[in-house]
Amino acid sequence: MNKEERAKRQSKIRNFSIIAHIDHGKSTLADRILEKTNALTQREMKAQLLDSMDLERERGITIKLNAVQLNYKAKDGEEYILHLIDTPGHVDFTYEVSRSLAACEGAILVVDAAQGIEAQTLANVYLALDNNLEILPVINKIDLPSADPERVRQEVEDVIGLDASEAVLASAKAGIGIEEILEQIVEKVPAPTGDSEEPLQCMIFDSLYDPYRGVIAYIRVVNGTVKVGDKVRMMATGKEFEVTEVGVFTPKTTQRDELTVGDVGFLAASIKNVGDTRVGDTITHAKRPAAEPLAGYRKLNPMVFCGLYPIDSARYNDLRDALEKLELNDSALEFEPETSQALGFGFRCGFLGLLHMEIIQERIEREFKIDLITTAPSVIYKVFLTNGEDMIVDNPSNMPNPQTIDRVEEPFVKAAIMVPNDYVGAVMEICQGKRGTFIDMQYLDETRVTLTYEIPLSEIVYDFFDQLKSNTKGYASFDYELIGYKPSKLVKMDILLNSEQVDALSFIVHRDSAYDRGKVIVEKLKELIPRQQFEVPIQATIGNKVVARSTIKAMRKNVLAKCYGGDISRKRKLLDKQKEGKKRMKSVGSVEVPQEAFMAVLKMDDN
C-alpha cells in the first residue's frame, strides 16, 4: 500500500474493547457482534466463541484476552475495520484488562439492566479512563423481567459520571440493539492516531507459544509499518529477529503482507525463547529503531505464593517446562525452584490471587497431565530482626527464630465491597472476623452500599471471596488494591508428626487466632492421616511451645488370641513383647502424609 491508501485505511479503523463485571454478558455481546459483521459462517458459530480455553468454557468466565478483526459496512455506506479486544472481568485478571485497554481507543461498558453497577465495573471504568478511552455505555439484558434500564441509566450517571442519555438499550442474548452499538462505535470512537512513515512501534499485549512457529506475539501497531522479512528488535531485551509472518485474527489467524498503524494482529519471527517476548514490550525495526519504547503497562507483582510439587518426583522437569510455557502467556506468573523435606523438589510460585492460582494449577494438570501437590498459599511478609536487619519472607519455612524477631509487617489491602442494604451486617461481620478495619460507607442509591475496609491480604487469600458470596447470596462484589505494609502480631505455626516437623504444613498466623487454628488443624489431620502400627502424636507448636495436640491411636494385633485361659504371666509376656516392638517401630517409623491433609490446611476455615 502507498501512503495515501494507508492513511485512508487508518481513518476507517476503530479499536475497542468490552468491559463489564463478571456475568454481565460481555462474551455473549462479543458473539453477537461477530455474527452481525458476518465474521463467521453459521456453522462455525458457537457460544462464547472468544473463550477458547476449555477451562473458560467450563467455568463460564473469560481468563485470557482475545482479539478479532471485523469488517462492518456502516449506514453511511463506508466500510469500517473494527478490532474487538475481549477482556476478562474477574478481579484476579485486572492485568489482562489493563493490557487490552492499552491497545484500544474506545471501550463498550456493559452494565446489567437488572443488577446495575458492580465493583469490578467501576474498577475497569477507572482503568479505561486512565487510558483516555472513549466510553460507550450499553445497558444489557433489557429482556429480563427484573430489568430496570432507567434506574441503571441514572446509576451510570451518578456513580461513574458518564453521560448515559444515549446509552444503548440492548439484549445480547436476543440480539437487540447490536446494530446501534456498532453505529456508535463508528461515530464516537476516534480513529487511531499515529504515522505509518515514522519508525516502527508495536506494543506486545499478549503472546502464545506454538511448537512449530515459535513464539507468536499479539501486537498493536502504534507507528510505522511491519512486513514479512523485516528485521525487528525487542526494545526491552535488545534481541533481534526476522519476521516470518504477520497477520490478523478474523477469529482464525489470517496471514497478511503487512500490518500498519492501528492494526491489531500477530507477528511470528521464529523466536525460540519464551523470555524474549515480554508482554508490554515494544517492537521496532532493527535498522531504523524508534527513539523510545511505548509506555507499556506496569509489571504486576504477584500477591499470593504457594509451593507446587509434582506427586511423582520424576516429573520435576516436566513441571518446569509447563510453568515456562504458561509464564509466556501469563506475564504475572512467577516461579523459582524450592525443596521441601516432606515433598521433595518443586517450585515456589507467585500468583495475582486465588482464582489465578487455581486456574494455573488446573491448566498444569489438564494441559500437561502432571499431578500436583500444593502447599498453603501465603503472602510476602517483611520481618525486622532485633539486630537491625530486615528480610522478606514469602515461605513460612524461612521464618527466622521468634527470639530474633523485633516485629513482622504484612501487606494490607483496601477492599471496596458493593453490597445490597440487607447484607451490610453480614459483610461487616466477615470483615471484622478477618481483622479488617472499617474505613468508610457510602450509599450508591436506596438499595446499594459501598463499604471500604482495610484488611490484611493474608486474610483475603484464604476464602474471603467464597464467604462474601455465600453470606450475601452472591450479591456482593468486591475489588481490592494494595496499600502497603503494617506491623501485626504474627507467629509461625509448625506441625509436628511423631515429633518431626513437616515443613510443608507450616503457616503464618495472627497470634490471637493461633490457638483455635492449631486445634482445628490437629483434629483435621487426625481424621485424614491413616492409622499406623504405632501411635502418632500430632502437635501444633509456636517456637518451642505446643499449643494443641492430638494422638492417632495405633493399630494392634490381638496377640492373646492363641492363649486359651492359661496363666496371666504368659499373657503379660506377649503383651510386653508387643509393646516393645511398637516402641522400636515408633523410633524408626515415618508417617506418610496424604495429599488431602495438605488441602485440609487450606480449607480449615470451613467449620
UniProtKB/Swiss-Prot annotation:
Transmembrane segments: none
UniProt xrefs under InterPro entries: EF-4, EFG_III/V, EFG_V-like, EFTu-like_2, G_TR_CS, LepA_C_sf, LepA_CTD, LepA_IV
Ranges for domain tr-type G: 11-193
Keywords: Cell membrane, GTP-binding, Hydrolase, Membrane, Nucleotide-binding, Protein biosynthesis
Localization: Cell membrane
Top EC class, one word: hydrolase
Reaction catalyzed: GTP + H2O = GDP + phosphate + H(+)
Binding site for GTP: 23-28, 140-143
Listed EC numbers: 3.6.5.n1
Domain of life: Bacteria
SMART domains: EFG_C (SM00838)
Molecular function (Gene Ontology), one example: GTPase activity
GO terms classed as biological process: positive regulation of translation
GO cellular component labels: plasma membrane
Family per record: Belongs to the TRAFAC class translation factor GTPase superfamily. Classic translation factor GTPase family. LepA subfamily.
Role according to the record: Required for accurate and efficient protein synthesis under certain stress conditions. May act as a fidelity factor of the translation reaction, by catalyzing a one-codon backward translocation of tRNAs on improperly translocated ribosomes. Back-translocation proceeds from a post-translocation (POST) complex to a pre-translocation (PRE) complex, thus giving elongation factor G a second chance to translocate the tRNAs correctly. Binds to ribosomes in a GTP-dependent manner.
Annotated PANTHER family: TRANSLATION FACTOR GUF1 HOMOLOG, CHLOROPLASTIC (PTHR43512:SF4), TRANSLATION FACTOR GUF1-RELATED (PTHR43512)
Name this protein carries in UniProt: Elongation factor 4
Organism for this UniProt entry: Bacillus cereus (strain Q1)
Gene responsible for this protein: lepA
